[in-house]
């Protein structure tokens, strides 16, 4: 354990639900998304009429919103922020990573993340990312089930550089 983590006050943040700055525009990436205009609206819960849990409702919390809250968090004694996934994904929880090299545009830009880290550090706060590197979403540049990415995904070809990342029972239709 790093010495700076011993005795730390850690605050976990689910970025979409933490604070909306109003600085990050909502890009149109998926026709099935629901954007909650009112911060106090109830989030969607449970499966839809087909029994599928979509995780497709967004409240617009973003990285600049987190940065705006840093003085408040520092005042609480927080010295470590644990951020749930921030990489591009299709769900609000972002555990279905689409691209590990891109900050989800719903949360902001790489520059927004850089500013957040610099501002946090200036207040004595460290940032820990929840890096989900043991799985991706099926709609990712690595699996590319729907063909939305330019890269050759494991679902599309056994020649994909990412093919070995996945376990197929019967390629391509059956996978774990």
List each language-model region with its residue ranges.
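A short, structural micro-pattern
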Residues: 5-7, 94
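Extended acidic/polar, glycine-enriched regions
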Residues: 1-3
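Mature N-terminal segment immediately following signal peptide/propeptide cleavage
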Residues: 9-14
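Substrate-binding/active-site clefts of carbohydrate-active enzymes
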Residues: 15-79, 86-114, 118-176
């Amino acid at each position: 354990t790093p010495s700076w983590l011993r005795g730390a006050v850690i605050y976990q943040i689910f970025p979409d639900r933490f604070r909306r700055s109003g600085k990050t525009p909502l890009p149109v990436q998926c026709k099935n998304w629901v954007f909650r205009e009112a911060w106090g609206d109830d989030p969607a819960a449970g499966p839809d009429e087909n029994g599928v849990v979509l995780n497709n409702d967004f409240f617009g919390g973003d990285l600049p919103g987190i940065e705006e809250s840093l003085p408040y968090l520092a005042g609480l004694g927080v010295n470590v922020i644990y951020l749930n996934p921030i990489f591009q994904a299709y769900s609000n929880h972002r555990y279905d990573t689409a691209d590990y090299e891109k900050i989800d545009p719903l949360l902001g830009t790489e520059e927004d993340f850089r500013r957040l880290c610099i501002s946090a550090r200036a207040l004595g706060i460290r940032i820990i990312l929840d890096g989900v590197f043991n799985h991706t979403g099926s709609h990712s540049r690595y699996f590319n089930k729907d063909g939305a990415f330019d890269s050759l995904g494991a679902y599309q070809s056994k020649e994909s550089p990412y093919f070995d990342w996945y376990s197929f029972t019967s390629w391509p239709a059956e996978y774990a």
